[in-house]
Amino acid sequence: MIYNLPHLKNREAVLLTAAIEYLHVNANGINFRVAVSGPPDGPVILCLHGFPEGSMSWRQFMQLMPQARIYAPDLRGYPGTDQPRGGYDVFTLTDDVKALIEALNLDRPLLLTHDWGGAIGWIFAHRYSPLIRRLVVVNCTHTKTLVRAVFHVTDWQPFRIPWVPFFELPWIPEAFITSSLGRKLLRWSFTSREGQKGTMNREVVDEMVARFQKSSDIKPIIDYYRQMVSTHFTPRKRAKLYDVYKTPISVPVTLVWGMEDGALSSKVAFKSGDDAGCEVEIRPLPGVGHFVDLEASEKLAQEVTRLL
């Protein structure tokens, strides 16, 4: 398939797109689809996408980083990867990342994460810092910092993410999102959040939204939210997670932030280092919204190149 990429001439787009291939990898008991690009001897980057995205979210970034060996899996429960009934808690999700690193035989990759991938990335780095050489988080507050802000209503944080309580309802969110109206709203939820009008890659947005045709297509990824809420309201699970936070992250951390993010407060996010237990380098991107990977991949590529 040839993709019409903004800021790239058609010929360049064709050549670069051809460099991406897909692998199917068994890890932690399920099969993952993994997009791969770049030379085998290049610096290694492992990318974790956000909600409700997929490996295609990283496509343009991968095309702008021909010097790096990049792996971008579709996470557990997303179309292309197995969708088991369970395993959507953060402990299993971080174990998935560990298993992928081992199955792909990656030697301490740079872990690049966005949104829900960032939540997984923060917790993964607390648990498994020795497996990576650096954590880069794009528009995702440290999970402990974010939960505290929700409970304390810091900078109106709970009102910025109204879909979280909606997702606690049984079956209704799945039925609505996969309706014709719901898919239109889902598309709008991407395009309405760009920092500057017209900068988001609409073709990739359409590709992502089109995957959700029936409730079973999206239930697993809504379960990410349900399991996170359950973890914080179940004393045993919450204690287990907060024990994980006691181990400081021991690799360098960079937080790249699209400053026009309406869902996550930068005022809250920039305090993430307090809960990470380490210094966090903050790299603000003025004029960029939440979906940095879809609307400012050139800027993101520049930030990551600086860290290789």
Q: Residue ranges of each PLM-predicted region?
A:
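Active-site pre-Tyr helix/loop in NAD(P)-dependent dehydrogenases
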Residues: F51, T141, F291
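Flexible "cap/lid" subdomain of the alpha/beta-hydrolase fold that forms the substrate-access gate
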Residues: I2-A19, I30-F32, Y71, Y78-L112, ...
